[in-house]
């Protein structure tokens, strides 16, 4: 294991790779059992709401001239199931992504430097039996959710917070007031 938390720069975007193991760039992810299944089954390319594939392929790209990285086209996620302690190594070939990485990064920088998007994603039902509406998973992690939803209310459930945008039935759990 080498190159732990080395600072990387891809066309002005900075980050830290977790490690280089046996010459391969590796990113460690702790996750729920649900998310772990995607890593275990190698399905992250099909369902990647947090952009992990882009992140890891960027680390692989940044290592193209690094002598620690001997595998210049592959990267792996070392995924750890937080609930059960299971571990798996999910390896990806990034040959195709690496061809367009410079353009991808420049487009991302341009997007981030621009204005915040005006269109917000539609809320989803809180559950099959509730008439409340909540933020979808991607929006629930966004730091700008308050900007999009002025009347957003946060309720704390045993499994974590839920961000409700429409409350028709008052939840019987604590609410966080900000």
What residues fall within each predicted segment?
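Metal-dependent nuclease catalytic regions and adjoining charged, substrate-binding loops involved
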Residues: 46-48, 62-178
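Extracellular structured ligand-interaction cores
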Residues: 14-16, 23, 72, 139
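Short amphipathic alpha-helical face segments that pack within enzyme cores
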Residues: 54-62
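A short acidic, glycine-rich active-site loop
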Residues: 42-54
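Glycine-centered tight beta-turn/hairpin loop motif at sheet-sheet or coil-to-beta transitions
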Residues: 12, 21-23, 84
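A short acidic/basic microdomain associated with nuclease active sites
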Residues: 1-12, 18
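Conserved catalytic cores of phosphodiester-cleaving nucleases, focusing on short active-site segments
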Residues: 17-43, 59
């Amino acid at each position: 294991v080498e190159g732990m938390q080395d600072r990387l720069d891809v066309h002005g975007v900075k980050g830290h790779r977790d490690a280089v193991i046996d010459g391969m760039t590796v990113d460690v992810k702790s996750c729920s059992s649900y998310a772990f299944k995607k890593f275990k089954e190698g399905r992250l390319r099909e369902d990647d709401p947090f952009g992990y594939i882009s992140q890891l392929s960027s680390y692989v790209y940044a290592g193209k001239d690094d002598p620690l990285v001997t595998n210049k086209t592959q990267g792996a996620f070392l995924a750890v199931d937080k609930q059960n302690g299971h571990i798996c190594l999910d390896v990806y070939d990034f040959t195709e992504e690496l061809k367009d990485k410079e353009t991808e990064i420049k487009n991302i920088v341009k997007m981030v430097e621009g204005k915040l998007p005006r269109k917000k994603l539609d809320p989803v039902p809180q559950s099959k039996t509730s008439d409340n509406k909540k933020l979808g998973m991607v929006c629930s992690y966004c730091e700008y959710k308050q900007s999009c939803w002025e009347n957003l209310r946060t309720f704390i459930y045993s499994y974590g917070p839920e961000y409700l945008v429409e409350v028709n039935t008052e939840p019987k759990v604590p609410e966080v007031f900000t």
